[in-house]
Amino acid sequence: MIRNSKILMNKLKRIGLGQITSTNNKEDNFRKCKEMIEKAVENKVNLFCLPECFAFISGGIHQFESRDNAEYLDQKGGIIERYKDLAKQNNIWLSLGGFHEKILDDPNDMIYNTHLIIDSNGVIVCEYRKMHLFDVDIPSKGVKMNESKVVKGGNDLVVCDSPVGKLGLSICYDLRFPELYLSLRRMDAQILLVPSAFMKSTGEAHWKPLLQARAIENQTYVIAAAQTGDHHSKRSSYGHSMIIDPWGKVLHDLPDNLNDIAFVDIDLDYISTCRENIPVFNHKKLNNYKI
């Protein structure tokens, strides 16, 4: 099933997302994502977004599995080269959210969690390395993860020009830090991309309200491609990939356990309308806030 919303069809900017259940089988993950990209192309999507861990998710074997399966961005015959070829062959832009990137000569053998934007010529035009790492222990919810054990945090904010508008890049746990998105908005972001692999317990409580808050606060579209379902016996993701407009209206909410795509046609003028109606960025007292 393919889901479509049309908004102000006079100026088409079509953005899509895919919701998948990745595993530690890279070839199977690539096949699923390739099929989704081809569906998106059939539906004339300009930018298609995949979730965090689209290429690989740990099989629960050991804590260094993601590191051991990481690749360099320019690795010959690597997974990113294959996605670059897909983008070029299909004349589509891709948002690849959350790729395990090897770091050349890192003394601690760390990796990055990297969000890439690939243009329709198959060229990487933007790279964002996840800034906020998921180090939490919530015994009552059965949640424990120490991402910084293998992942090195990035430091740079990234806003990327694209055919659908200015994209503000982030990954998953970044969603809990509104200062990041405020900064992206101040860098003229019009669309916030939040590829994720939220756990079920935290997703049920916080996923939707956090996404809506980021859209409303910054008066931007939010495109949140998510992992869903059981990846292995010890890890499940919440799903509910969402597309939210600058007024906070949820345009798409894909059900849990559904591997599918959704897309919307947006008009960037609607962003301007929302910002003119409630000009919060003109009213902010940034010099008064100690953040």
Curated annotation (Swiss-Prot):
The active site is at E52, K130, C172. It is an enzyme of class 3 (hydrolase). Its EC number is 3.5.1.128. Residues 13-268 form the CN hydrolase domain. The keyword Hydrolase applies. The keyword Hydrolase applies. One of its GO terms (molecular function) is deaminated glutathione amidase activity. SUPFAM superfamilies: Carbon-nitrogen hydrolase (SSF56317). Keywords: Hydrolase. It catalyses: N-(4-oxoglutaryl)-L-cysteinylglycine + H2O = L-cysteinylglycine + 2-oxoglutarate. CDD domains: nit. Belongs to the carbon-nitrogen hydrolase superfamily. NIT1/NIT2 family. Catalyzes the hydrolysis of the amide bond in N-(4-oxoglutarate)-L-cysteinylglycine (deaminated glutathione), a metabolite repair reaction to dispose of the harmful deaminated glutathione. This is Deaminated glutathione amidase.
